[in-house]
A protein has these predicted regions:
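PLP-dependent enzyme catalytic core of the Aspartate aminotransferase-like
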Residues: 1, 114, 123-124, 138, ...
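Short loop segments at secondary-structure junctions
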Residues: 29, 220-223, 345-348
Length: 424
């Protein structure tokens, strides 16, 4: 089925006389006739629901739609994009393990991996996304368990060479995990290029209206956990906290990852999305394919205007032919990338501050990928916790402005940018 149709009708097919829109099952619990019936659910021997901290029908319908959009085999929703990335990483990493990650990932995820997970005994090596294959392979250690990157990095807007990173990951017997938030599956399906796990902050383009926090994890169902059983004991040996289930044996490579993340991590951490929020997310998904066209068109128009403005020192947007990532964008993102543009002003950080203050349509806010245009200075906000060396490695200089182009008229956006630049 075409992704446009999946956006509208995926995940839920109503039966005769059933609601056309997905139903909101706003209930914490579910009734069963016998304790034996419920016991089968607790033993993962039957399909169904017993407590919404783990699974809920509304959430599952929306997760199924996202799974279909990505071309995966199983998916789950979380309370935020950060929860999705943490669950996905912690689902296969434990104390003593190691992660290889792109250096240009979102500041919050960088902090999650480099600081919070380090407190759990999980270390990381960060690599330039444009590194050579030799440099990438040199980052691996015997205890490396996963490679992580973003299809389009936030806010440096670097493009991940998915095939290169997948090749290296698989050569070392580990999966490639890709955060596909910015392009969404409308513009890129990482599984088609070798990725194994995909994550999303559904708060961004999928919701698209700045209304609902959420995240998603999708399994491509191709990584053979049992073939590398010694690396992944959590999936390939009995889980003492769940009746001795061995997830990879019971559910195979198509379902083991999401089943473990749901039955074990969601049980223990509870970062679940509410049914009402899942319902609202679905409303956003229904128009995702249409909105992404406008976001991409506006992003390109703004990037082209900025590239030719004398007060702009540089522009990061992979759709521009001048971008060092243009060839990768043509390969992985032929139909467009996203509506986010980042750029630096010739006058430095103070010029960036003045520029943002003078904007009329674009609001200064810590958000991105909204219907309304917004901007911020990452070095003083989303990446504020990084030191100068880390900022440089992440592609986030002090003067950088990140602008998320919304659904307004491109002509109006450019006029607003022009008048603000005139005052710098």
């Amino acid at each position: 089925m075409n992704r446009d149709t999946i956006c509208v009708q995926g995940g839920y097919t109503p039966g005769n006389g059933e609601p056309r829109q997905i139903p909101i099952i706003q209930s914490t619990t579910f009734k069963y006739a016998t304790s034996e019936d419920m016991g089968k659910l607790f033993d993962l021997e039957a399909d169904g629901y017993f407590y919404s901290r783990l699974q809920n029908p509304t959430c599952d319908m929306v997760a199924k739609k996202i799974c279909e959009l990505e071309g995966g085999t199983a998916a789950m929703l979380t309370s935020s994009g950060q929860a999705a990335n943490f669950f996905a990483l912690f689902n296969i990493c434990e104390a003593g393990d190691h992660i290889v990650a792109s250096s240009t990932i979102y500041g919050g995820t960088f902090n999650l991996i480099s600081v919070t997970m380090a407190k759990m005994g999980i270390t990381a090596t960060f690599v330039d996304p444009l590194c050579t294959e030799e440099e990438l392979n040199a980052a691996f250690r015997p205890n490396t368990k996963v490679v992580f990157g973003e299809t389009i990095a936030n806010p440096a807007l670097t493009v991940l060479d998915i095939e290169k990173f997948a090749k290296a990951a698989h050569a070392h017997g580990v999966p490639l995990m890709v955060d596909n938030t910015f392009p969404t599956p409308v513009n890129c399906r990482p599984f088609e290029w070798g990725a194994d796990i995909v994550t999303h902050s559904t708060t961004k383009y999928m919701d698209g209206h700045g209304a609902v926090l959420g995240g998603a994890i999708v399994d491509g169902g191709k990584f053979d956990w049992m073939a590398h059983a010694e690396k992944f004991p959590g999936l390939c040996t009995p889980d003492d906290s769940y009746h001795g289930i061995t997830y990879a044996k019971r559910f195979g490579k198509e379902g083991a990852f999401i089943t473990k993340a749901t039955a074990q991590l969601m049980r223990d951490f509870g970062s679940v999305q509410s049914p009402m929020d899942a319902y609202m997310l679905n409303l956003g998904l229904e128009s995702l394919h249409v909105r992404m066209q406008r976001h991409c068109a506006n992003g390109m128009a703004v990037a082209q205007f900025l590239e030719n403005h004398p007060k702009v020192a540089y522009v990061n947007y992979c759709g521009l032919e001048s971008s060092p990532y243009h060839a990768l964008a043509q390969k992985y993102l032929p139909n467009g990338s996203c509506g986010v543009v980042s750029f630096g002003l010739a006058g430095g950080r103070q010029a960036a501050s003045t520029f943002m203050k003078e904007l009329k349509l674009a609001a200064i806010e810590t958000h991105v990928a909204d219907a309304r245009t917004c901007c911020l200075n990452p070095a003083s906000s989303t990446h504020r916790q990084m030191n100068d060396e880390q900022l440089a490695a992440a592609g986030v200089p002090a003067e950088l402005v990140r602008m998320s182009c919304g659904l307004e008229s491109a002509e109006d956006l450019i006029a607003d940018i022009a008048q603000a630049l005139d005052k710098v």
